[in-house]
Design a protein with these regions (language model features):
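Intrinsically disordered, low-complexity terminal tails/loops enriched in metal-binding residues
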Residues: 7-8, 13-134
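Bacterial Sec-dependent N-terminal signal peptides
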Residues: 1-5
């Protein structure tokens, strides 16, 4: 059985939208914010709110009704790159509806983070964003 991938790319500055994002879940101009102030992205068939604080990356997961969705059986990772160094961080379920991971050091301004996510049902996807540029 072939895996299907959803790839979204977010650029910073004036609204620049990759074709895959424009065709999937367009939210109008700018960035849609989640209930905790993080960027909302569609990935692997769920809505993900991405939060970065210090060394911690948190992904809060929501269903189509924007209700918290169980992350039981989810796996994920985050590739953090600042142009000079790269670090891969494992994202593990934390509580009922989140995944978390920590980098070795603070995430630099201008860093790009690529989130890879696999649901319990086997859906996979990835999204890239720059947390400090919003």
């Amino acid at each position: 059985m072939a895996a299907s991938f959803l790839v979204l790319s977010a650029a910073v500055g004036p609204t620049v939208v990759a074709p895959a994002l424009a065709q999937s879940h367009a939210h109008g101009q700018g960035h849609q914010k989640g209930p905790n102030g993080g960027d909302m992205k569609d990935i692997a068939g769920v809505h993900a709110e991405i939060l970065v604080a210090g060394r911690t990356i948190t992904i809060n997961v929501f269903d189509d009704a924007d209700k918290p969705a169980s992350t039981k059986g989810f796996t994920g990772s985050a590739l953090v790159s600042d142009g000079k160094t790269k670090e891969t961080v494992t994202l593990a379920p934390s509580g009922e509806a989140a995944l978390k991971g920590e980098t070795k050091g603070a995430i630099a301004a201008g860093a790009t983070i690529t989130i890879l996510l696999k649901t319990e049902a086997g859906k996979t996807g990835q999204v890239r964003f720059s947390p400090h540029d919003h």
